[in-house]
Every structure is written in structure tokens, then in C-alpha cells.
Amino acid sequence: MAGHSKWANTKHRKAAQDAKRGKIFTKIIRELVTAARLGGGDPGANPRLRAAIDKALSNNMTRDTLNRAIARGVGGDEDNNMETIIYEGYGPGGTAVMVECLSDNRNRTVSEVRHAFTKTGGNLGTDGSVSYLFTKKGVISYAPGLEEDTVMDAALEAGADDIVVYDDGAIDVFTAWESLGAVKDALDATGLVAEGAEVSLIPSTKAELDAETAPKLLRLIDMLEDSDDVQEVYHNGEISDEVAATL
């Protein structure tokens, strides 16, 4: 949907996927455990862990649950053989797709990812085939209703790189991904309440989808997210309001 924030576009379906909350929590816990195992349990010194904590809180995970996950990671629990794997590919309509996975079995994971691409008319690419189109950034999102100048002044003072205001009034604040936690803390201190905060891969170009290719891309994303090994799916597909109305 052109002119709308990514919360209403590339991830717009997530709001309607409450049935998947259990699976989402499982994936977030896996990331918390892995981040704590690799970088320690102090989010101030571990940007990956801080990003995972922000994501957990954005999804209404309790502090008790996330603290237990961190403790498991620091203690070297059963997820110690998990590794991060990034797959790249081409989706319907020539879209560029990045698939971030946490897995203890590369063969299983690549088989599931390749199957999703093949079933929806896309194809799995090689390393570097589309990653050059994406930049890793921190994103802090605000719902419509805030004054643009207020958010902009606070964001720049907090050390943010950029802000984008969408047609619906939603605002995204972009930061270096390592600075996401510090910038969010500074914005929180001003009284601004974020709708969400996460590390994301931001595309430099967009691929416009039509009424035929848009449903195929959404199916690809759903198939990928149904895999227990897939943590996040990023893409550069753009769905216009007119096309979205037909879905």
C-alpha cells in the first residue's frame, strides 16, 4: 500500500495473525537465547540482544518470559547449536526477498525455504544476489496522531539518522541498527510512546506488484513464516491501495 508505513505494508498482515502469536513468541525466545549466548546477557553491551528485547516487548511478551530466555542463553542451554543463516531470492513480480533464519539443521532449512520460493513462482538465489538492495537499520515506529515536528526534533536530538512520515500519519524513525536501543531510550524519555521497535533490512528500491503478483508474494511470505526456522522475511514489494483493495 503506497504511502503507508511498513507496519501497514510489508508487515501489514501481522496485525491479523494473532493465531500465530504462539509461533512468534517461540521465534523471539529462540532469538533471545541465541543473542544472549553469543554476546552475553547485558543488552547495553549486546546490540543484538537489545534489539531482540525491544521486539519481544513490542509483541507484548512479559519481562519474566524474556528474562528466562536470556538466562537460558547465558547459561548455554539447549539452543547452543543454533546458527543464523540468511537466504536470498527472487519472489513473484521480480521482488527481492531476504529470509533470516535460526537453525540447527541447514539442510532442513534450505529445503523448506527453497520449496516456498518454488511453489510461488520465485527462485532461491545465491549469496549477494539481492542483499545489495537492502541496508540493515533500526526502525522505531509511531502510530498516527503525533506531531511531525515533535518527533523529528526528538529523533534528531536522540541521534537518529532519518524519519519518514507516511500519508496515514504514521512515522518511522531510522537509526544505525547498533544504536536502536539508545535512540529508543532517548525517545521514550521524551514521553513519545512507540508502536514498535526492531532491526530491519530496508530496501533501497521498490518493486510494484499487480493484482496477479501481490497475492503470490503474500503466499510466499506466509509459507516462509510458517517455517519454525524462519525468523524474519524482508522484501521490496510495493502494493498499491488499488491492488490491496482486491486482496
Curated annotation (Swiss-Prot):
Task: Tell me a GO biological process for this protein.
Answer: regulation of DNA-templated transcription
> What GO cellular component entries does it have?
cytosol
Q: Where in the cell is it found?
A: Cytoplasm
Q: What InterPro entries does this protein's entry cite?
A: Integrase-like_N, TACO1_YebC-like_2nd/3rd_dom, TACO1_YebC_N, Transcrip_reg_TACO1-like, Transcrip_reg_TACO1-like_dom3, YebC-like
Q: Which UniProt keywords apply?
A: Cytoplasm, DNA-binding, Transcription, Transcription regulation
Pfam family membership, one:
Transcrip_reg
Q: Which GO terms describe its molecular function?
A: DNA binding
Among SUPFAM superfamilies, the record links this protein to: YebC-like
| Family, per entry | Belongs to the TACO1 family.
Read off the NCBIfam families from this record: PRK00110.1, PRK12378.1, YebC/PmpR family DNA-binding transcriptional regulator
Q: What is this protein called?
A: Probable transcriptional regulatory protein YPO2055/y2255/YP_1898
Native species:
Yersinia pestis
